[in-house]
Amino acid sequence: MDFVKALLDKKLLLIGNFMLTSGKVSPYYLDLRKLPNHPDIFSFVVSSAVDIVKGINFDMILGVVTGGVPFASFIACKLNKPMGYIRAEKKGHGTERLLEADVDGKKVIVVDDVATTGGSILKAVEEVRKAGGKVEHALVIVDREEGAFEKLESVGIRLLSVYKVSEILNSLIKSNLVAENEKKLISDYMVKNIGKS
């Protein structure tokens, strides 16, 4: 499967001017929250993710709301592992918990869709550890390579990814799928941001 072409065709990779959760402005945006709307691509990505984590010794998978939840659910189902999720902030009703899982004494893999600086994953890891869980691995579909790997490594977490954004963007730049001015914007952004933490 030509993943980059599929991302563009399904408008999951957008070119323009986008504000990221991290506060950075980017010339591209990966809208992976819509990936489950496309079962062929979603299934391909989930199978790739399963191949990455199946050799790891862990007890459960925890999805980061909202982007990580569909991936965590399907990966957990394929591996017959329990699954939970973690919110960014407490809801104002019900149990008012951030963490919807019993992680005490369990080895947990935290799953999200995309990592930029690693802030969302780090917050999830901290909550899991506070609740007695052990986290040594996090998995994302795409690592934007803007510091998440290093930030997580500094707290003992190995960040795994199905794709590195440099692979996606280099493929995009080499293709005829985007205009020359868009290729330049992306290339300039890569030089300034990717691999610089």
From Swiss-Prot:
Gene3D superfamilies found in the cross-reference section: 3.40.50.2020
Pathway assigned to this chain's UniProt record: Pyrimidine metabolism; UMP biosynthesis via de novo pathway; UMP from orotate: step 1/2
Swiss-Prot/TrEMBL cofactor(s): Mg(2+)
Domain of life of the source: Archaea
Enzyme class: transferase
One GO BP annotation of this record: pyrimidine nucleobase biosynthetic process
Quaternary structure (record): Homodimer.
This protein's name: Orotate phosphoribosyltransferase
The gene coding this protein: pyrE
